[in-house]
Amino acid sequence: GFPLAQTPVYSFINAAMELQTNGYRPDTGRFTYEAVSKILKHPYTRQLSDHATRLERELTKTNRFYPLPSELKKDDFLTILFTPQSNIRELCDYLLRLIKSISILYRKEGEYDDIFNQLYRESIFQSHLNSDRSTVSGS
């Protein structure tokens, strides 16, 4: 099959994992600019949030190197994205919610014949299966 590591969903999941693991500092309750900027620039984030582009520009313009989660939660999707996860179970559930949000982008009528959409839908499905297995085995 098509390598999952070469799909947009993989890069998005990696950016989300980086955001939650190395990009969030529990001691200060803040995210790092680098991790926030990377995920705000991702095409999926920009498709799922009308505020992503503007927020990324604002953080850059105002030199917000360590934004608080409350500064980043501009809509429902960004609220999910920028809610810190404190343990592995929460992280797995978080990834599943993000994958489900992304899957909405590929449910449009008339796109089922497009080979890239088929590949991306399959990559989302495989990512969901892998995350779901992690959640079940982590219980």
Locations of the language-model features?
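Polyanion-engaging groove/track-forming segments
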Residues: G1-S139
